[in-house]
């Protein structure tokens, strides 16, 4: 999948695929690094990759829980959400 410029360029389904690829270590080492750096960059969440690797609270580390936490944090901080569709 081509990486996009902003989280608002992704549907939740598209972004879930990136999270799944990170969790499942899909691709070679460069692709894994690119996906993780992209995740950190576009989510802008202060916990960064810890959302996936060291989840806290109600986040069980599943792609759905990670997306839920990202959405809640972005909304609470006045940031754009995922593309509808």
Swiss-Prot record:
Belongs to the colicins ColE2/ColE8/ColE9 and pyocins S1/S2 family. This is Colicin-E8 immunity protein. InterPro entries: Colicin_E_sf, Colicin_pyocin. Keywords: Bacteriocin immunity, Plasmid. One of its GO terms (molecular function) is toxic substance binding. Pfam families: Colicin_Pyocin (PF01320). It comes from Escherichia coli. GO terms for biological process: bacteriocin immunity. This protein is able to protect a cell, which harbors the plasmid ColE8 encoding colicin E8, against colicin E8, it binds specifically to the DNase-type colicin and inhibits its bactericidal activity.
